[in-house]
């Protein structure tokens, strides 16, 4: 499954009462697809999945599939720390017509490597969809060891990719070196996109692509075409906004950044809160320099 170079971890728009706003979602999807997005992740971390109900997630999957209409792959965030619930949601996502699912490592209950292997194996066995693993130990505590990722890629045909947000380039290099060529490793950290490309990564599952998708595409294309100095210049240009988007809990900064760009996507749900005025001014200043 080709997810492209830049997959956007899409925010979930809300109205002024905090309900999912599908009209805003339609506008957002069109905007992203015109600005460098090769595929969309729906109801992931940036989509505020912890505060979305199961019914809301299914509605988001269905609506996004309909709105995208085959233009790019749609990847549904169906992972959780409850294997049975993840299987149920994955089946609903498949019924909705998504192209793949993303499964985060189980959080809070701190499973062993064998527990994580069996968790992912059980979910993958219940779907024909391609599976992208998601390793983000900064959020989940549990980190998927490279050996476990390699084992999953070898043993389970529909485990086809991983979003790696561990920040461990040595581990990421090992995964790339010891998995099949058609197993794709994506950076889960915008700021590490270029370093991960340099060790053989495929691209990025991005937050910054909401704001700088075209530039990120150009950076990756320059790198793959051997124009590494030009790629480095774009990386240096984008690094301040990549950092600014994570100075406050994600996705409050990126939602504010979209609003500053004239795209109303609403606020965040509690326990997240909007940016302070100082945070907003800092973000606005950084965006204006892009």
UniProtKB/Swiss-Prot annotation:
Site (described: Part of a proton relay during catalysis): 45, 108
Keywords: Amino-acid biosynthesis, Cytoplasm, Diaminopimelate biosynthesis, Lyase, Lysine biosynthesis, Schiff base
Main location: cytoplasm
One GO-annotated biological process of the protein: lysine biosynthetic process via diaminopimelate
Catalytic activities: L-aspartate 4-semialdehyde + pyruvate = (2S,4S)-4-hydroxy-2,3,4,5-tetrahydrodipicolinate + H2O + H(+)
Source superkingdom: Bacteria
Catalytic activity, EC: 4.3.3.7
Catalytic residues in the record: 134 (proton donor/acceptor), 163 (schiff-base intermediate with substrate)
First-level EC class: lyase
PROSITE patterns found in the cross-reference section: DHDPS_1, DHDPS_2
Pathway noted in the entry: Amino-acid biosynthesis; L-lysine biosynthesis via DAP pathway; (S)-tetrahydrodipicolinate from L-aspartate: step 3/4
InterPro entries, A to Z: Aldolase_TIM (IPR013785), DapA (IPR005263), DapA-like (IPR002220), Schiff_base-form_aldolases_AS (IPR020625), Schiff_base-form_aldolases_CS (IPR020624)
Gene3D superfamilies hit by this protein: Aldolase class I
GO molecular function annotations of the record: 4-hydroxy-tetrahydrodipicolinate synthase activity
Function: Catalyzes the condensation of (S)-aspartate-beta-semialdehyde [(S)-ASA] and pyruvate to 4-hydroxy-tetrahydrodipicolinate (HTPA).
Matches recorded under PANTHER family: 4-HYDROXY-2-OXOGLUTARATE ALDOLASE, MITOCHONDRIAL (PTHR12128:SF66), DIHYDRODIPICOLINATE SYNTHASE (PTHR12128)
HAMAP family: DapA
Record protein name field: 4-hydroxy-tetrahydrodipicolinate synthase
Organism, as annotated: Bacillus subtilis (strain 168)
Gene field: dapA
